[in-house]
Swiss-Prot record:
Keywords: Hydrolase. Belongs to the UPF0173 family. This is UPF0173 metal-dependent hydrolase LSL_0324. SMART domains: Lactamase_B. Gene3D superfamilies: Ribonuclease Z/Hydroxyacylglutathione hydrolase-like.
Length: 219
């Protein structure tokens, strides 16, 4: 599979002829050169309802007919608007021909509309486990994500203010013991301005993975 980090929390996965977008914050994203018209997603996965994660979801799904996958209560809003949806609750998994999406906890708030809880995502694709922490503070149950299988790749927010900062994110990396870790959700807005080296200095060398924005890599 090919994975592309488009800055902030926007991730693209290409696998088995499918395009999967996660938290497609494109319009207003100061990092990516990707435009909504460049994309034709089959699935859009959302961690929660804040605008910098929902982003261009509706425009993209209207154009491509993508299935929106998110937490059970939040997904109802999209279903009422006529979108194709899948909405498992915390701990639930939805199975697709390209992989599995499990909805897992995150410690964060959500917007008033659409309703729903903030989540993380555990993706099993081609036998590999990808942990998308979403917006979250540090919490001890993160270590359960990889209890049956080592996490191959984790995306952890480091921006502070709205999520955990570099210190807590580095501790989270030690908890989850992923093979590779990518920091996200930082330097997008003034309150989350960070020096990424404040995160890297406390992360074991073998876990460090630097993703170039808009540049796909193989997993």
């Amino acid at each position: 599979m090919k994975i592309t980090w488009h800055g902030h929390a926007f991730i693209e996965i290409q696998v088995a002829g499918k395009q999967i977008l996660i938290d497609p914050f494109i319009t207003g994203n100061p990092f990516t050169k990707t435009k909504p018209e460049d994309l034709n997603p089959d699935y859009i996965l959302l961690t929660h309802s804040h605008r910098d994660h929902v982003g261009d979801t509706e425009e993209l799904a209207k154009k491509s007919g993508a299935t929106i996958v998110t937490e059970m209560d939040m997904v109802n809003d999209y279903a009422q608007k006529g979108f194709k949806v899948e909405g498992p609750n915390y701990g639930g998994t939805v199975h697709f021909d390209w992989g599995d999406v499990k909805i897992i906890p995150a410690w964060h708030t959500t917007a008033n509309v659409p309703l729903g809880m903030a989540t993380g995502l555990a993706l099993t694709i081609e036998g590999k486990l990808i942990y998308i922490a979403g917006d979250t503070g540090l919490f001890s149950d993160m270590k359960l994500v990889g209890r049956k299988q080592q996490i191959d790749l984790a995306f952890l927010p480091i921006g502070d203010y709205y999520t955990m900062g570099p210190d807590d994110a580095a501790y989270a990396a030690s908890l989850i013991e992923a093979k590779k870790v990518i920091p996200d959700h930082f330097n997008t807005f003034p309150p989350i301005k960070q020096d990424v080296n404040d995160f890297w200095k406390d992360v074991p060398e073998n876990m460090k993975f630097t993703a170039e924005i808009d540049k796909p890599f193989e997993l």
